Regions:
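Structured alpha/beta reader/binder surfaces that contact nucleic acids or chromatin modification marks
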Residues: 2-173
Length: 173
């Protein structure tokens, strides 16, 4: 698998062309600029348990940037390896927002490695409302539009039984 960051956090991520085409990717939305900064600086992303997609397990996260990103809107530009999952209350993840209406709700905190930039951004020419997309590294490499990521996988994936824990072999604390 090239020299990319593995799931225990050692090594370095090189580029998307060195990764196995069959590795699973979850495309997730970055609602605001601060969510990109949290991913980049703090190394994590959050998903409310109440909004968990049906196929949540992935080895990588890729990030869709909506209209709030101005000139970089409606694109996927960044991806990162998933290191581990943990459940936490929103107020633990965002202590500066103790009065938030969802402060007591449970979230998955997904620890990620360093963000890498795709060679070319993947635009959403027609599709604008994206929450989660299950795809593969191979599909991410081939996509010319976000809609291409919804096509059936052309890459051979391990059977779902291997992913039985639902967390692709990552630790859950």
């Amino acid at each position: 698998m090239g020299g990319h960051l593995n799931h225990q956090g050692s090594g370095m991520i090189h580029d998307i062309w060195e990764l196995e085409a069959t590795e699973r990717v979850l495309v997730a939305i970055l609602p605001q600029q601060r969510d990109l900064e949290l991913a980049r600086e703090a190394g994590w992303y959050r998903v409310p348990l109440a909004r968990l997609p049906s196929h949540f397990a992935a080895e990588y996260l890729a990030f869709y940037q909506p209209a709030t990103f101005g000139t970089e809107r409606w694109t996927i530009r960044y991806y990162a390896p998933v290191l581990r999952y943990r459940i936490a209350l929103r107020r633990e993840l965002l202590p500066a927002e103790p009065q938030h209406p969802r402060a007591e709700e449970r979230y998955y905190q997904i620890d990620i490695g360093p963000l890498a930039t795709l060679p070319l951004p993947i635009p959403a020419r027609r599709l604008r409302r994206v929450s989660f997309i299950n795809t593969t590294i191979g599909q991410l490499r081939r996509a010319h539009d976000v809609a291409d990521l919804f096509h059936p996988a052309e890459d051979a994936q391990p059977p779902d039984e291997i992913w039985g824990a639902g967390l692709a072999g990552h630790s859950l604390t």
